[in-house]
């Protein structure tokens, strides 16, 4: 049975004081109401250690928004998975649309990260999704297929148990727009089918992978989204950055 996951992406928001306050609030509130859902938060890199210490021993998982695909080395400005392990972080987000759009991260670059992380016993949250222009030109499925096939190329089947996917329609992020549950379900179903075609035997593996929806998820739409067969949770931006709205997602 697939896990239902509510993952909060704090992006480059919140001061240290705000992040610490939110982490304490989450520790106090979320474990008691999460029930059968898995809760995750992805603070900014500078706040990871503080938030990890606060949530240590709770059911809330702390993840990193990014890292580099290397051990300790001369890559100025980057963060190594080795450094993340030192502070107890074992989940990393890869391929978020903002990193693709503004920092030029390609499917192949994402693939380098994913393969390195999985081989080093991390769980990866891999983000895929189309822009407004790609959607309007009818290229949604083509774009997603490339992101899945190129981003997950060469990954051994044994590692797929540590893989989570998130579909984030770029046109819906931070705009207040949201795909209808049926529109989101159609794309999630396609993603699952694409995974099932990656290699022989992938069909059963694809059924076990959680696929989150990540387009302006809020308390007033999360329940309708979760009713769909292939939507297994949410990758949440703004609504995860206040304890009141984050708690309502559970």
Swiss-Prot record:
The lineage of its organism: Bacteria, Pseudomonadati, Spirochaetota, Spirochaetia, Leptospirales. It catalyses: D-glyceraldehyde 3-phosphate = dihydroxyacetone phosphate. Pathway: Carbohydrate biosynthesis; gluconeogenesis; Carbohydrate degradation; glycolysis; D-glyceraldehyde 3-phosphate from glycerone phosphate: step 1/1. Involved in the gluconeogenesis. Catalyzes stereospecifically the conversion of dihydroxyacetone phosphate (DHAP) to D-glyceraldehyde-3-phosphate (G3P). SUPFAM superfamilies: Triosephosphate isomerase (TIM) (SSF51351). One of its GO terms (cellular component) is cytosol. One of its GO terms (molecular function) is triose-phosphate isomerase activity. Its EC number is 5.3.1.1. It holds the Pfam family TIM. Substrate binds at residues 9-11, 174, 216, 237-238. One of its GO terms (biological process) is glycolytic process. Belongs to the triosephosphate isomerase family. This is Triosephosphate isomerase.
